[in-house]
Amino acid sequence: MINDLISDSLTRIRNAGMRRLETTQLLHSKVIEALLGIFQAKGYIESFNVIEENKKKFINVVLKYDEKGKSVINEVKRVSKPGRRVYKGKDEIKRFKNGYGTIVVSTSKGVLANDEAYKAGVGGEVLCTIW
């Protein structure tokens, strides 16, 4: 049984990128789907789609690589964990890696990237960072 679905999903994406796999399969949840929507909008993955097999939902993720075949994801890291929650205010999530990275935040307005959360004027639980 998986206790932390977000950590498991990020690890699967990281491992698939290191092995240069074209796709990887994740367990489905609404938070993971929102997280992947941000990754796709920011250009870290090509696409994703939800599939249902035997009444279970999965997400197929198509990874993105540069012209040299290297994954465009340099590092993806889980920040807030089940044993230690990390919360940041709107002023603390303004920029990450001088604008080259993204902080994904779970807010009262949904799961948002750091620039969207700053514009909306909300803070929240920091789910992960990616660059």
Swiss-Prot record:
Part of the 30S ribosomal subunit. Contacts proteins S5 and S12. One of its GO terms (molecular function) is structural constituent of ribosome. Keywords: Ribonucleoprotein, Ribosomal protein, RNA-binding, rRNA-binding. It comes from Campylobacter lari (strain RM2100 / D67 / ATCC BAA-1060). One of the primary rRNA binding proteins, it binds directly to 16S rRNA central domain where it helps coordinate assembly of the platform of the 30S subunit. Belongs to the universal ribosomal protein uS8 family. GO terms for cellular component: ribonucleoprotein complex; ribosome. This is Small ribosomal subunit protein uS8. GO terms for biological process: translation.
